[in-house]
Amino acid sequence: MTVEGFFDPATCTISYLLFDSGSGECALIDSVLDYDPKSGRTRTASADQLIARVAALGARVRWLLETHVHADHLSAAPYLKTRVGGEIAIGRHVTRVQDVFGKLFNAGPAFAHDGSQFDRLLDDGDTLALGALSIRAMHTPGHTPACMTYVVTEAHAAHDARDAAAFVGDTLFMPDYGTARCDFPGGDARSLYRSIRKVLSLPPATRLYMCHDYQPNGRAIQYASTVADELRENVHIREGVTEDDFVAMRTARDATLDMPVLMLPSVQVNMRAGRLPEPEDNGVRYLKIPLDAI
């Protein structure tokens, strides 16, 4: 198992390439379509880095995984699918996100709320094959109702936590930054606490890969820790922090946070599996901005 991270400084997002060298198969996780909110321009520079690395490895893309419907960047999954293939997968509870935001954006009857925009909807405990690797979907709601953690192990080997990895999306961050916010529609701090405890019940040596790193105090980029690191050092949820204490802390902290800059553009695209709106009769695509609604 090889894991490579690709950091996008504009959104502090880490996209991942998960590679099984024996089979040559790979998965791309939480990709980014570059978007400039001032000009409305999209670019594919971040996604093209993944494409170049896939080509350099001679890999075959089997899965394009989303840990959740992101509210801080646009997904590049459809672009990647056209360039390198792969099936787009997300947690089945994406339908709850589609219900909420379909109404907010007045998406109309043409917008299906059944997750059919994605190739594969995953339930808790579902597994995906990637060569000799097994990817298990672990439902970890709290940040959003649809959040999934992807736990990766060798499919046919005796379990060894040193060879296990989990892509945690927006649940945990590096120990010096803590945990994800829970104040988006459908978010819930108590659910997040329980989800994180589920992640932290994995073997202590399991490597945890973050979806974001905000470089507190200007430190260098970091995006991987272990279960043991988080239990020992996480500033929000280390061992000994009770559920009630966490909920109180998370609720108070969330009340001070601004909305992500790209939330409105991101969600209306990502609830459609990253597909941009169809051009109107003048050949131009448009995003919607609801006024005084959030």
From Swiss-Prot:
Q: Which InterPro entries match?
A: Metallo-B-lactamas, Mito_Persulfide_Diox, POD-like_MBL-fold, RibonucZ/Hydroxyglut_hydro
Name the cystine pairs.
none
Q: Which cofactor does it need?
A: a divalent metal cation
| Keywords assigned by UniProt, alphabetized | Hydrolase, Metal-binding
Leader sequence range is none
For the protein in the UniProt heading, the enzyme class is hydrolase
Q: Which Pfam families match?
A: Lactamase_B
| A Gene Ontology BP annotation from the UniProt entry | glutathione metabolic process
Q: EC number(s)?
A: 3.-.-.-
Function of the protein: Probable hydrolase. Does not have beta-lactamase activity.
Q: Which PANTHER family match?
A: PERSULFIDE DIOXYGENASE ETHE1, PERSULFIDE DIOXYGENASE ETHE1, MITOCHONDRIAL
Name of the protein in question? Probable metallo-hydrolase BURPS1710b_2304
Organism from which the protein derives: Burkholderia pseudomallei (strain 1710b)
From which lineage does this chain's organism come?
Answer: Bacteria, Pseudomonadati, Pseudomonadota, Betaproteobacteria, Burkholderiales
